[in-house]
């Protein structure tokens, strides 16, 4: 099993969700996040004064899937989230040793 974490632009969330559903994923966890990378922050005007906004709004998507779906899920996220502009985001993949469904006690792939 693998855990895929994707940091994307908030307005791309619906497209990414639909792309993952087409791959066959049944559930995702979404968290609002703020951060910056190479794009750094940007300047905004507020009441006539310019402020530097260091952290930009992002969305973090987390999914845990079987190894057989990893490449398809990564490709779906990448295609749906890509705008071609700086700040499109990142995808991280890590190993998951175990998953347990609290309600039933199922474990492994049966739990996801």
UniProtKB/Swiss-Prot annotation:
Record's GO cellular component, any one? cytosol
Look up keyword Transport and say if it applies.
no
Any Gene Ontology biological process: regulation of nitrogen utilization
List the Gene3D superfamilies: 3.30.70.120
Q: Name one GO molecular function term.
A: ATP binding
Q: Which UniProt keywords apply?
A: Nitrogen fixation, Nucleotide-binding, Phosphoprotein, Transcription, Transcription regulation
User: What InterPro entries does this protein map onto?
Assistant: N-reg_PII, N-reg_PII-like_a/b, N-reg_PII/ATP_PRibTrfase_C, N-reg_PII_CS, N-reg_PII_urydylation_site
- Positions of modified residues (O-UMP-tyrosine): 51
Q: Which Pfam families match?
A: P-II (PF00543)
The record's listing under PANTHER family reads:
NITROGEN REGULATORY PROTEIN P-II, NITROGEN REGULATORY PROTEIN P-II HOMOLOG
Function as written in the Swiss-Prot or TrEMBL entry? In nitrogen-limiting conditions, when the ratio of Gln to 2-ketoglutarate decreases, P-II is uridylylated to P-II-UMP. P-II-UMP allows the deadenylation of glutamine synthetase (GS), thus activating the enzyme. Conversely, in nitrogen excess P-II is deuridylated and promotes the adenylation of GS. P-II indirectly controls the transcription of the GS gene (glnA). P-II prevents NR-II-catalyzed conversion of NR-I to NR-I-phosphate, the transcriptional activator of glnA. When P-II is uridylylated to P-II-UMP, these events are reversed.
Give the family this protein belongs to, as stated in its UniProt record: Belongs to the P(II) protein family.
Quote the subunit structure annotation: Homotrimer.
Provide the protein name. Answer: Nitrogen regulatory protein P-II
Please give the organism.
Bradyrhizobium diazoefficiens (strain JCM 10833 / BCRC 13528 / IAM 13628 / NBRC 14792 / USDA 110)
């Amino acid at each position: 099993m693998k855990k895929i974490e994707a940091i994307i632009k908030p307005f791309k969330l619906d497209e990414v969700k639909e792309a993952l559903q087409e791959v066959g994923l049944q559930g995702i966890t979404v968290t609002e996040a703020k951060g910056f990378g190479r794009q750094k922050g940007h300047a905004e005007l507020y009441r006539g004064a310019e402020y530097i906004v260091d952290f930009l709004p992002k969305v973090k998507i987390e999914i845990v899937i079987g190894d057989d779906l990893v490449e398809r899920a990564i490709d779906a996220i990448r295609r749906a989230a890509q705008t071609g502009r700086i700040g499109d985001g990142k995808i991280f993949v890590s190993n998951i040793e175990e998953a347990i469904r609290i309600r039933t006690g199922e474990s492994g792939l049966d739990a996801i």
